[in-house]
Amino acid sequence: MILKKLSVLNYKNILQSEVIFSPKMNCFFGNNGMGKTNLLDAIHYLSFCKSHVNTPDSQIINSDQDLCVVQGNYDYEGREEEIFCAMRRRQRKQFKRNKKEYDKLSEHIGLLPLVMVSPADADLIRGGSDERRRFLDLIISQQDKPYLHALIQYNKALLQRNTLLKDQSMDASLYEVLEMQLGMYGQIVYEKRKKLVEDFTPIFNEYYQTICGSAEEVGLHYISQLEETELAGKLAMSRERDRILGYTSSGIHKDELEMTLGGYLIRRVGSQGQNKTYLIALKLAQFAFLNKRGQTTPILLLDDIFDKLDASRVEQIIKLVSENGFGQIFITDTNRKYLDEILLAMNHDYALFRVERGEVQPMEE
């Protein structure tokens, strides 16, 4: 899959831009705050109907404007695809595929597989468990529609049960229906998350060791209450306690993904360089996983990934992304030197752009 052209209007600080891309490597350089990350975020938006950092749509629209438009023209295995998104303040956003609007945004997820690596990924290590669950959900949802459906239905039932709890409702029949749904959909989510972690961890370990050049092992450990008990029954037993708390205290929305380095939690023992390497390896493994199981090669977005890495690790990453297994790549950096090194290391078509004050200018070499 190739993104051939991106048209942007009022996406954060990018007021108006139309960019034609290389089918292989696209490099963007410029100072911080100029719009490099926003450009990659607009590409991410076309795949997931949302910002990489979960920015509300109202904050995506340029602060001086009322309308934001993002459109991408893709070559999808020889087939033309046009994806269009328009957002207006205080209105429902439009999301269209080939000029036909989606009934549900969830129908779009997985069509345009994409992996983004950015400084915001640090929250996977230092943030709460919801960040790590979201990471698992994002991988599975791109290649498994039944999983996405189960996750959406689980969250709907969870919201309804929490509303009953806050309202101090005593309607046992309503609780029973919702707890049955939570149990059924929660079991689907649990089993698929568990299987993903089992299949994904060896790939992740291989990428980490390749980048850092050592045999130090990394690990992912999925911890869930469903390992020991059936959810619907547990919810029925904890109903009175949950009513006092005002929320549902058990379920797959409480699951944890432990991330370890050398057998210890990385958030406790990892240096800045180790954390950065860990996250890059995690995302490159995500790319490899999706590429192997999907119908088309994902797009890879690499946003400012070389900061806080020593020269040997930078060299290994450049070598990895220069390999033929990676499809179309978009990479940003304030330091053009790293971008030039990547372009020298690979024998592929490329495009180089300068980003300044929200304007994207192609560079003639």
Swiss-Prot record:
MF-aspect GO terms: ATP binding; single-stranded DNA binding
HAMAP family, per database record: RecF
Family under the similarity heading: Belongs to the RecF family.
Key words of the record: ATP-binding, Cytoplasm, DNA damage, DNA repair, DNA replication, DNA-binding, Nucleotide-binding, SOS response
Function: The RecF protein is involved in DNA metabolism; it is required for DNA replication and normal SOS inducibility. RecF binds preferentially to single-stranded, linear DNA. It also seems to bind ATP.
Name of this chain's protein: DNA replication and repair protein RecF
PANTHER family per the UniProt record, alphabetical: DNA REPLICATION AND REPAIR PROTEIN RECF (PTHR32182:SF0)
Keyword Magnesium included in the entry's annotation: no
Swiss-Prot/TrEMBL GO biological process terms: DNA replication; DNA synthesis involved in DNA repair; double-strand break repair; SOS response
